[in-house]
Amino acid sequence: MKKLLIHTICLLSALTTSTAVAAPFTAGITALNRQHDATAFRAWKRIADLGDAEGQNNIAYLYERGMGVKQSYQNAKIWYELAAAQGLPEAKHNLAMLTYQGHINGRDTRKSVEWFREAADAGLIQSVYMLGVLYMEGEGVFKNYDKAFEQFIHAAKRGDARAQYMVGAIYAEGFIDPADEPDYAKAFLWSGLAVLGGGEQAQSLKIAASVYLEKDQEKQIVEQAAQCLKTNFEICE
């Protein structure tokens, strides 16, 4: 199986709640873009202390990375938990990543599954993808390739390039059912969509799949990919 790509932590760059904290939130984004990490931390700490979930998530991100403040997974956990308690999906995803990567009292994949599932249920595609990874690997859940594919295809149809790559890889290897033959046409389609979405790692898979296709098949699939994008993936399987 192709190497699984892992989604990293989520930093919020757009405010979704009260405009009362918009100025310091935006100031933090501007500072971070200019690599003024300590200034970003101070700006977000102000609104985090006022209970703003986005600010809490973002200073947790800085603690986790050691950007503008001394690196501390424990402090990152505290602030992520405060934001997650307010229902912020990104904070739940980030807590899941901390536990998945073993940064909080050892690796706890079952707890990761809980956080990823909550964030995925709230619509966070990064978490949908990560549930696919966990089902594929059998981490925190029983290994189940069908469920892994369900998560990957769902995220792929929402435009996630990593998920599109994984869908292509699964089709290329006939991974769902050992009795199935590889479907190189679908592998070419989804890896091509991943490349269009910025997933450079999918280029090698696209090339490998193309070896098994005729030129007229490739042309038809390229046209199908265009229709997939035009219809927001409604016609893609």
Regions from the language model: what does each represent?
Residues 17-58, 234-237:
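N-terminal leader/linker segments that initiate helical-solenoid repeat arrays
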Residues 36, 49-53, 65-67, 72, ...:
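Short helix-capping/linker turns of helical repeat alpha-solenoids
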Residues 7-16:
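Bacterial N-terminal signal peptides
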Residues 35-42, 70-79, 105-115, 142-151, ...:
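Structural signature of tandem alpha-helical TPR/SEL1-like repeats
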Residues 44-47, 82-83, 118-119, 154-155, ...:
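Canonical positions in the second alpha-helix
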